[in-house]
Amino acid sequence: MDPQKPYKKELKRNSRKRSLNMSQNSERIRIIERDITELKVDAIVNAANNTLLGGGGVDGAIHRAAGPGLLEECRTLNGCPTGEAKITKGYLLPAKYVIHTVGPIWQEGTKGEDEFLASCYRKSLELARKYDVKTIAFPTISTGAYGFPSERAARIAVSQVKEFLKVNELPEIVFLVCYNKEACKNIKKALEENL
């Protein structure tokens, strides 16, 4: 399955960074309810833990689908702090790269969780730009076992992606991948509110 096929469009490449109007910006964001491990995009984002050695949820699914090469490469990275991101090859995944980011554990909003989550999106997008990633897929970071409220996380995700796309040509398309209808509803609402 190639989710980007119907959405491919050529962007004028005047420079690596340029100002994009809001309608172009919004057209570059797609909301889909799919298995992120099956997407044929340049990079998928892994909602990882600090060790980067696999875990539950999307992290475990990505490690299983990518095969043992991913774990071997992750062992060489020496973990990742919360709010940061690191990149590896995709191995057996359809995606060329996996960008691993460590979201915050929700603690009632008292430990800077919003900024850590925002940083996850920014740092992942910065790595994507650095590696010339044209299409990237994000899961809903920190909303599973880490307990971040889904609506709040959706608003942060949408605002960070839109802010980045305003001034960057790459990635061309950002997929926000929902694991259920509730997550999709929250992301759609956040996107509508952030027009």
UniProtKB/Swiss-Prot annotation:
Residues 1-13 have a biased composition (Basic and acidic residues). PROSITE patterns: MACRO (PS51154). It comes from the Archaea. Residues 1-23 are annotated as: Disordered. Residues 16-195 form the Macro domain. GO terms for molecular function: deacetylase activity. InterPro entries: Macro_dom, Macro_dom-like. Belongs to the MacroD-type family. This is Macro domain-containing protein MA_1614.
